[in-house]
Amino acid sequence: MNPAPDEPLVCFGFSGFRVPVTIPESGCHSGWWVRGWLLAVVDWYCHTRNGDEEMLREIVRPERLDLDSPGRRDYWVALEHDSIWGDHLFPLTVFVGPEASEGQGLVAFGSNHGNEYEGPVALKHLVREIRLEDVRGRIILIPVLNPSAFLSGTRESRMDDGVNLNRAFVDGAGRHPALSGITHRIADFVRTHIWPRVHIVLDLHSGGDVARFAICANYHPVDDPLQAAKIEETARWFGTPALMIYQNQTPGLLPSEAERLGKITVGTELGWGRAVNPEGVRYGRQGVLAALINNGLMSGTIEPIAHHKAGTQKRLEMVDRGCFIPAPFAGHYEPLVECGTAVKKGQTVGYLHDFDQFDLPPYACVAALDGVVLAQAWAAPVPKGQHIVVVAKDLDR
């Protein structure tokens, strides 16, 4: 039923939907009370306790995003769902300051993988903390890049196409019929709408269910010495105990593509075990803020923290295949040392047990080089072929 012309129409908004409610002004005295109460509820709901910031995000298709006009905008980006009649929605907040220029800005991603939570939590905090009046350039924050994987709490988009987003940045992603699932379309969205607008890329990861790490910021070796220096400096500002320099042979990586485009690109490993590590959140928040302030995208000052401040960060390189110890059979892993421990070549750093061959001795996981245990399997049960220990070369020894 349509309201009479003289009856006000109030739109209630819940989870991105607006529901029209007609409130008649005529009738008994209680009508006035109900009308006033409902309007008060609407006013309370539509504003946060931190001022007049809108809680409701606009749901838009990618082509309707405004990532260039001055101001702040909060979106749910809608990409068509593969099965239900609807959309995958992921949050995007953009700040554009008065000094923003074409092709310059920072993007920070969380939840490239759906079971890694320090990045999403750190970015969710920053969405609320960053003030528009402090913004000078362009800032794009995407706390949950892969909503399908995040919903299922898995590394891949298990409920949809089963693809790992950090392997989806391949030729034809989102364009070729064979690569048209939601995960490849997210990669295409990043390529089409994000890459042209930023020169700094921060991809916040954790170990998830697979591995526990010595907490680190990480990056690949790049040929351009100026780009390499800027990347290392950006990584140091996270404050983590380690900086991981890792192999760049895996196809389809988001950071690899950003690096090839000449962008200052840094990733992280901020925790493990599908939990939220408070130190990981602290490091993630620090790294994003430092990149913003140090590159003139946001006003303010920032001081080094933790291992960056103390000058104790270690550069750990895991480029050679000898760094990795794969499981020769499915079994249960027993670590003998903690991540971050210095070890010698030939030292046994863990055991792999086969409980089906109960009376056999465990398989010894032996370090192939002098270095530091950078990562180990998180769960005790491991499948055949999984890298259960990574011993990285300490470049600062």
Where are each of the predicted segments found?
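Structured catalytic-domain cores with a bias toward divalent-metal coordination
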Residues: P8-F12, T22, G27-C28, W32, ...
